[in-house]
From Swiss-Prot:
Co-factor: note: Binds two Mg(2+) per subunit.
Gene, per the UniProt record: dnaG
Record's keyword terms, sorted: DNA replication, DNA-directed RNA polymerase, Magnesium, Metal-binding, Nucleotidyltransferase, Primosome, Transcription, Transferase
Keyword Oxidoreductase tagged: no
Domain Toprim: 171-250
Name under which the protein is recorded: DNA primase DnaG
Binding site for Mg(2+) 1: E177, D219
Binding sites annotated in the UniProt record for Mg(2+) 2: D219, D221
């Protein structure tokens, strides 16, 4: 046949003869009837001897006294010379003893085939050989910054506890379980952390907690529960934060860490609810703390003049609303026996009015009624409430999902006859049992 390694074009020729002819007749007609037609430079015999055209490939079939088929001639001439040669072949009118007609079907550019093969192979090589995904400038900067933060981890005290570089200078510290937790918080830009490295609380941590605003950030499992119980007994803890369920602090993303620290719980409230046989992370926070406990934590926070060395974008505590921040205690038995007020004007009167109704009420800042709904209706409209809503009263049990939705909507209090499965109380949202 022919090779596409050295040729440029392939001439496709269609042959029809009025009789039975052989392949040798076709080849002879091509050489014989074009000889001297185009001059010495385009003589087919000379071109074939010099390798500028290939072998003449003839594929014909004789049937019913006629012959038809195809013929292929490979050419390494330029386009103009190849076109002239192809046009000359169409002048052939006899093959052997028979009348014949030759027609050029097309001239195929074999270099275009090579180009298509190159493109397809390049695509395969691009997918197979270049595995590494291009890295952006942001990714490079993030990787370098994280590496520098990891290098800044230090040790403090005679126990050589892993800690962030700013733990001694900062007015606020975060106590975590181990070195891996310190490293992860450093990657997130939080450099005022210290690890206890076990269930026995080191003296260095106890001393720091007495001088600084202290938050404990532990896993929500048995190990974190044991560490937290001892810290609450021997150290001066202000706030407690938990990792999400089935997640460790060392594996959390920056977004998860910020969210957990935002939802920290005052330790003073936590201490008054601890039962020895109940995991702290599973505790239902029925807020019954008095004004004195709540204000003592606030005074300690306000007494620090220096801004804590924590990331600038960590959320601040929500601003206080016009409603008194004292937690409303549960209604006593004597109050329950009172006649329901016809026109309630306070939150406590509204809770008394809604008790045993099985419904819910939405209140404005001035304790005015916005609307009464069933619990299912309230859950449906809660995300759509207007900004003038201050709180809700529910004569039913509410869960953590409801509390999270209320906090996200900006409510300042939720009153209910029971709180079930509450593992964290968002800062600034009061839970009022009745």
């Amino acid at each position: 046949m022919y090779s596409i390694d050295s040729i440029k074009y392939l001439i496709h020729i269609h042959i029809e003869a009025e009789g039975v002819v052989e392949k040798t007749d076709v080849v002879g007609a091509i050489f014989g009837q074009t000889e001297g037609l185009l001059g010495e430079e385009l003589d087919l015999r000379d071109l074939q001897r010099s390798g500028r055209i290939g072998r003449i490939d003839v594929q014909i079939v004789s049937k019913h006294g006629k012959t038809a088929g195809e013929c292929y001639i490979a050419s390494s001439l330029d386009r103009a010379e190849t076109a002239i040669l192809a046009a000359a072949l169409e002048t052939i009118d006899r093959i052997g003893p028979c009348m014949a007609a030759i027609r050029i079907q097309n001239i195929e550019d074999l270099r275009a085939i090579k180009r298509r093969q190159i493109v397809e192979r390049a695509k395969e090589l691009l997918l197979e050989s270049f595995d590494e995904v291009g890295i952006s400038t942001y990714d490079i900067l993030t990787e370098v910054r994280e590496a520098s933060r990891v290098e800044k981890i230090t040790t403090i005290g005679p126990e050589r506890l892993p800690a962030g570089p700013a733990v001694l200078e900062s007015d606020a510290i975060i106590i975590v379980e181990g070195r891996a937790d310190v490293l992860n918080l450093l990657k997130c830009g939080i450099n005022n952390t210290v690890a206890v490295e076990g269930t026995k609380v080191p003296e260095t941590v106890i001393d720091l907690s007495a001088k600084k605003n202290t938050t404990v950030f532990v896993d929500g499992d048995r190990g974190g529960d044991l560490i937290l119980r001892e810290l609450l007994q021997v150290a001066d803890i202000d706030f407690v934060a938990f990792s999400p369920r089935r997640r460790s602090v060392e594996d959390m993303s920056r977004k998860e860490i910020v969210k957990s620290l935002r939802n920290k719980v005052p330790a003073s409230v936590l201490k008054s609810h601890i039962e020895k046989d109940e995991p702290i992370s599973d505790l239902v926070f029925e807020i019954e703390a008095g004004e004195e406990e709540h204000s003592s934590v606030s005074q300690k926070e306000e007494g620090n003049n220096t801004t804590p060395d924590v990331p600038a974008d960590l959320p601040e505590e929500p601003p206080k609303s016009n409603i008194d921040e004292a937690i409303i205690p549960p209604i006593t038995t004597s109050e329950q026996n009172l006649v329901k007020p016809e026109n309630p004007h306070t939150i406590q009167e509204h809770t008394q009015y809604m008790k045993n109704t099985g419904r819910s009420r939405v209140l404005a800042e001035d304790a005015g009624v916005i609307g009464d709904y069933s619990l299912q209706e309230l859950k449906a409209i809660l995300p759509k409430l207007n900004d003038d809503v201050a709180g809700v009263i529910v004569d039913a049990a509410v869960d953590q999902k409801f509390i999270d939705q209320a906090f996200a909507k900006g409510l300042t209090y939720v009153a209910a006859n029971a709180f079930e499965g509450i593992v964290r109380r968002p800062a600034g949202l009061r839970l009022i049992p009745f």
